[in-house]
A protein has these predicted regions:
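Conserved alpha-helical "signature site"
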Residues: 1-170, 177-256
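Terminal helices and disordered tails flanking the catalytic cores of nucleotide-processing hydrolases
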Residues: 1-14, 238, 258-292
Length: 292
């Protein structure tokens, strides 16, 4: 009689277990830019000089500066000129978003593209809400960009397993029964770790600030986040899904006005009444960076 398979062997791993050591490093220019932004001596010129040291980032900044999104821009030919036109805040946004795009470039599949667009949309929304609420705009944008970095990590190192995760959750979306916890459970079952924990480990390996790591680890647990800027990421993530920038396997579960209620009062009054107007604004900003 053939012995039955033990529970431990019932599911053979599709690929090697997830290991952050097998991931490529995040672009050094973007990480250095983050350090500049978090330091007391950071300045527009510091950031400009950093960008000029890398050809790819220089081209990205010039393309954004010459895009229709930037008013009065025409024939911007130098990074310094682009920096003065864009300003520190917007320049920082371009560097971080382009850094994430460069990070996933080798595997820029439709899945990765959707994850990237979702992250940028979340970052833009969080930054706006922070600005309107007099909170930390830099932190809000950075947290928005990195909140789903764990998905990128899992999809990069375990593409077959993560495709199964997405397929399973997409089926739940079609049946209109998906919940945020379903994705995390599927990730843990098929990959051995969920994207929140994977993101936490990855950002810790990159030696990023503890406050940022905590947001990435807890962005699906609003109550676990401290007050202030950190609380903007969860509604920004959900809002980006509602506006049409959902990552594969995700679906917005609430209406526009319900999500708005989770933002600070000062931010709620500044968001457009028309959801389509907001979606169009975000799409234009993403397109400007995407084409860089």
């Amino acid at each position: 009689m053939t012995p039955s398979a033990s529970p431990a062997k019932a599911r053979e791993p599709l690929e090697l277990p997830w290991d952050p050591e097998r991931l490529p490093p995040f672009p050094a220019i973007a990480l250095k830019a983050l350090n500049l932004m978090s330091g007391t001596d950071s300045s527009l010129i510091d950031l400009c000089n950093l960008i000029r040291s890398d050809a790819a980032f220089s081209v990205a900044v010039l393309r954004v500066a010459n895009s229709p999104l930037v008013a009065f821009s025409k024939n911007v030919t130098s990074v310094l000129q682009a920096s003065m036109l864009l300003g520190f805040q917007r320049l920082r946004s371009v560097v971080i978003a382009f850094g994430l795009k460069a990070y996933v470039r080798e595997a820029f599949t439709p899945l990765m593209q959707s994850c990237w667009r979702h992250s940028v949309a979340c970052a833009i929304l969080a930054e706006r809400a922070a600005r309107w609420s007099f909170l930390d705009k830099d932190f809000a944008y950075t947290a928005g960009i990195f909140h789903d970095i764990g998905k990128v990590a899992l999809a990069t190192t375990m593409p077959k397993a993560y495709t199964r995760v997405v397929d399973r959750n997409s089926e739940l979306v079609r049946e209109s029964v998906v919940q945020p916890a379903d994705l995390l459970a599927s990730e843990r079952e098929l990959c051995g770790i969920d994207h929140c924990e994977a993101g936490r480990l990855l950002l810790a390996a990159w030696d990023l600030p503890p406050a940022l790591i905590n947001v990435v680890a807890c962005h699906h647990e609003q109550k676990a986040l401290a007050s202030g800027t950190s609380t903007l990421i969860s509604p920004s993530c959900e809002m980006s899904e509602l506006l049409g920038f959902a990552a594969p396997g995700a679906k917005p579960l609430r209406r526009y006005e319900q999500i708005l209620a989770d933002f600070p009062e000062m931010a709620r009054s500044r968001f457009p009444v028309d959801m389509e107007e907001l979606a169009s604004e975000i799409a234009k900003e993403i397109q400007a960076i995407e084409s860089a």
